[in-house]
Amino acid sequence: MGLEKSFILFSLLVLVLGWVQPSLGRESSADKFKRQHMDTEGSSKSSPTYCNQMMKRRDMTNGSCKPVNTFVHEPLEDVQAICSQGQVTCKNGKSNCYKSSSTLHITDCRLKGSSKYPNCDYTTTDSQKQLIIACDGNPYVPVHLDDSV
């Protein structure tokens, strides 16, 4: 009887671990948004090499060069607040996008035409624009930067 209970408990443990394990170490959409788009310090954003450094540092040049990316130089709370501002339709047709009511300080990074992996070379453009972001989850948080206008 004791051996049977142990086997059942062991089987349940294996089942639970098999269910939980795949999500361990997987980056959430909210964490990916922060990694790819948030740079509150923006220490060298005015430098022409800012995008080259940040794209590499944030793992967006592993295996290929990400063609376009935007870094936001505002507090995370300000970006999260966009999720309760003006709702708009996302580029993919979904209805979970929101447009910031004011402009935010951003840096656009665009892959130069002649650039090829592994030598990813980006142009750096500093500007003030409104952001359109997709929000999801509970709590409702940014998960995708859809556009800047």
UniProtKB/Swiss-Prot annotation:
Binding of substrate, residues: 32, 35, 66-70, 91, 110
PROSITE patterns per the UniProt record, alphabetical: RNASE_PANCREATIC (PS00127)
The keyword Cytoplasm appears for this protein: no
Alphabetical UniProt keywords: Disulfide bond, Endonuclease, Hydrolase, Lyase, Nuclease, Secreted, Signal
Compartment list: Secreted
GO cellular component, one term: extracellular region
Major localization class: secreted
Gene Ontology biological process terms, A to Z: defense response to Gram-positive bacterium
Family matches, as CDD domains: RNase_A_canonical
Segment forming the signal sequence: 1-25
GO molecular-function terms, A-Z: lyase activity; nucleic acid binding; ribonuclease A activity
Active site: 37, 144
Catalysed reaction, written as an equation: an [RNA] containing cytidine + H2O = an [RNA]-3'-cytidine-3'-phosphate + a 5'-hydroxy-ribonucleotide-3'-[RNA]; an [RNA] containing uridine + H2O = an [RNA]-3'-uridine-3'-phosphate + a 5'-hydroxy-ribonucleotide-3'-[RNA]
Record flagged with keyword rRNA-binding: no
InterPro entries assigned to the protein according to its UniProt record, in alphabetical order: RNaseA, RNaseA-like_dom_sf, RNaseA_AS, RNaseA_domain
Disulfide bonds: 51-109, 65-120, 83-135, 90-97
EC number: 4.6.1.18
Subunit structure and binding partners: Monomer.
Protein family per UniProt: Belongs to the pancreatic ribonuclease family.
PANTHER family referenced in this protein's UniProt entry, alphabetically: RIBONUCLEASE, RIBONUCLEASE PANCREATIC
Cited function: Endonuclease that catalyzes the cleavage of RNA on the 3' side of pyrimidine nucleotides. Acts on single-stranded and double-stranded RNA.
Protein name: Ribonuclease pancreatic alpha-type
Record lineage: Eukaryota, Metazoa, Chordata, Craniata, Vertebrata
